[in-house]
Amino acid sequence: MRFDLEPPSHASAAHRVAVLLVNLGTPDEPTPRAVRRYLAQFLSDPRVVEIPQLVWQVILRTLILPLRGRASAKKYAAVWLPEGSPLRVYTERQVESLKPLFAANGYRVIVDYAMRYGTPSIADVLAQLKRAGAERVLLLPMYPQYSASTTATAFDAAFAALGRMRNQPEVRTVRHYADHPAYIHALAEQVRQYWAAHGRPAFDSGDKLVLSFHGVPKRTLDLGDPYHDQCQQTAALLMSALGLTTFECRVTFQSRFGKAEWLQPYTAPTLKELGAAGVRRADVFCPGFTADCLETIEEIGMEVRDEFLHGGGKEFHRIPCLNASHAWIAALGEIAAENLQGWPVRVATAPEAVT
């Protein structure tokens, strides 16, 4: 096996620690070519599509990429921000917000981000962190609920990069934080602040809050993936924090791909049914997405909105994701601090948690 080229080893006074946020990824630009390149990498991951690769690659290259590339590019163009892809923009803001938070609490750590698909890649950022003197890296996926198709494949990519290194850094991973009190608090605060600015649904009159999580094939649940259970756990804790019951709140799953059965109930049909049943207002919040992206802005904010209004609903609200909200940045800092314990982060003072 050939290892990546590295400079000669020498005693380093840095001994630095890094916190690496890892998210899914995004095309570099909203063009058919860039989107096809991104989708080819994403949909070629056997963790994402569990079909024999010889068969799947023929379907992917001859049918899916030619058809979806242009259509998906139009959707990305509809949500693209002046600074770039929403997912990248909000992830960068999370990083830039975490840096002063750590510094203010005496933590001397490098904070950066990487994408599982597209750029910046996990391998490239790990190499960059090594060059910056990082000898210990905390991998912090931006997936609160564990799934093999998100968390595990991010770890796969990180460990594959480590496998090519002669001089490996020490690595820790955060598996999930679906029930972490700080995460639940951040979710509840996001909803409360939105309602404070836009009005609270009239739950006594039948208005609904829908908690929409990204779907996965139902088969993965049957094969032992804990994702569904953790989504339900998050939803139950959030409902409790908001003082809501299953009468006021529904849990659904979105972004179904292909014809196989996925986790149900599906988000879009549920909103259409609510509109047809006379529900006047529906608010949709996506607790499993830590940053707004195509699936939240376009799929929920445009497609699902139309389903609800065309079904008979009168008022639709998409509550923004956590993004770089104060409560979420504080939660990220707390989650990271708990997992940095025992590492030489050179704390000037010794706070119990990053706040």
From Swiss-Prot:
GO terms for molecular function: ferrochelatase activity; metal ion binding. Pfam families: Ferrochelatase. Fe cation binds at H214, E295. It comes from the Bacteria. The keyword Lyase applies. Pathway: Porphyrin-containing compound metabolism; protoheme biosynthesis; protoheme from protoporphyrin-IX: step 1/1. PANTHER family: FERROCHELATASE (PTHR11108), FERROCHELATASE, MITOCHONDRIAL (PTHR11108:SF1). It is found in: Cytoplasm. Its EC number is 4.98.1.1. It catalyses: heme b + 2 H(+) = protoporphyrin IX + Fe(2+). Keywords: Cytoplasm, Heme biosynthesis, Iron, Lyase, Metal-binding, Porphyrin biosynthesis. Catalyzes the ferrous insertion into protoporphyrin IX. GO terms for biological process: heme biosynthetic process. This is Ferrochelatase. Belongs to the ferrochelatase family. One of its GO terms (cellular component) is cytoplasm.
